[in-house]
From Swiss-Prot:
GO terms for molecular function: phosphate:acyl-[acyl carrier protein] acyltransferase activity. This is Phosphate acyltransferase. It catalyses: a fatty acyl-[ACP] + phosphate = an acyl phosphate + holo-[ACP]. One of its GO terms (cellular component) is cytoplasm. The keyword Lipid metabolism applies. InterPro entries: FA_synthesis, Phospholipid_synth_PlsX-like. Keywords: Cytoplasm, Lipid biosynthesis, Lipid metabolism, Phospholipid biosynthesis, Phospholipid metabolism, Transferase. Its EC number is 2.3.1.274. Pathway: Lipid metabolism; phospholipid metabolism. It comes from the Bacteria. Gene3D superfamilies: Isopropylmalate Dehydrogenase (3.40.718.10). The gene is plsX. Homodimer. Probably interacts with PlsY.
């Protein structure tokens, strides 16, 4: 039985969206058990599942504007902290939250703990591509500064995840840079390029540019945390902007535009689905001793369900334990 500790109070629509996603996951997956951490009375308003689910009551939660490290240290009984402690103590196999990203990263670092020989765990997510296959990118903001050695580790971690969780036999690994030539980039990118090119265990395809990411140029894209987070926000903003422009053009374009939209309804729905994070799952803090997964703060029940499905796959493939063995040399 796979045990998942869920912060029921994190996110814009908690606890309703969280609990409704849990209800659906428990209905579809008979091999998972969920521990819900949060306000019992509020959780029970939405909980319909009766088997393989438990509620651990707490009145305390971490707010979106709390300073991450201070919140983890001072709010000992916060729903997120208790969920992370359950993983540390072996009472759960993974933790999920839609709450404060920085606080969850701190909980992953300081409570769950790093895998031996991994210097800086990175935040990784599967982002959309036009062919629907997606690509894994890290670091998406767990670390503001990185060394070439960190980026090399991210390449290994991302490749490992793509193989074991996404089923890609030889993941193409690309280094995000300001040009595709091997001579491009600042000293960090140049040093990283040399490390990746020398690692025969990686299917390194060289530098990749941001404009090509959504065309599926690589299966794994490596970046420092600052750049990766900026790219992530740009992709999110562009997706929302495109959908907003289409909506404005349709609603303000008169009868012809509305008729055209009706004829293109299926195509537009497909586009919206491709750009939607709800089906993808959450961002994984990769490099800690158990799956620590952050789903989007504005996640609905569908996104929570998809993230639980993602965690289930991670536990099923034992990717974290395999990663630990790989890096510890055991």
């Amino acid at each position: 039985m796979k045990k998942i500790a869920v912060d029921a109070m994190g996110g814009d629509y908690a606890p309703q969206a969280i609990v409704e996603g849990v209800n659906q996951a428990l209905s579809d997956f008979s091999d998972i058990e969920v521990q819900l951490y949060g306000d019992e009375a509020k959780i029970k308003q939405y909980l319909t599942a009766t088997e393989r689910v438990s509620i651990i009551h707490t009145d305390e939660k971490i707010d979106s504007d709390d300073e991450p490290t201070r919140a983890i240290r001072n709010k000992k009984n916060a729903s997120m902290v208790l969920a992370a402690k359950a993983v540390k103590d072996g009472e759960a196999d993974a933790v999920l939250s839609a709450g404060n990203t920085g606080a969850l990263l701190a909980a992953g670092f300081f409570i769950v703990g790093r895998i031996k020989n991994i210097d800086r765990p990175g935040l990784m997510s599967t982002l959309p591509t036009v062919d629907g296959k997606g690509f894994d990118m890290l670091d998406l903001g767990a670390n503001a500064e990185n060394t070439a050695q960190h980026l090399h580790q991210y390449a290994v971690l991302g490749s490992f995840y793509a193989k074991n969780v996404r089923g890609i036999a030889q993941p193409r690994v690309g280094l995000l840079n300001n040009g595709t030539e091997s001579s491009k980039g600042d000293p960090l990118r140049k040093e990283t390029y040399e490390l990746l090119a020398a690692d025969e265990s990686l299917n390194f395809i060289g530098n990749v540019e941001a404009r090509d990411l959504m065309n599926g140029v690589a299966d794994v894209v490596v970046a420092d945390g600052f750049t990766g987070n900026a790219v992530l926000k740009s992709i999110e903003g562009t997706a929302m902007g495109i959908m907003g422009l289409l909506k404005t053009a349709i609603t303000g374009g008169g009868l012809r535009a509305k008729l055209g939209a009706l004829l293109l309804k299926d195509s537009l729905s497909g586009l919206k689905k491709q750009l939607n994070y709800s089906d993808v799952g959450g961002a994984v803090l990769f490099g800690v001793k158990a799956p620590v997964v952050k789903t989007h703060g504005s996640s609905d029940a569908k996104a929570v369900y998809s993230t639980i499905r993602q965690i289930r796959t991670m536990l099923e493939t034992d990717v974290v334990a395999q990663t630990a063995r790989e890096f510890s040399g055991e």
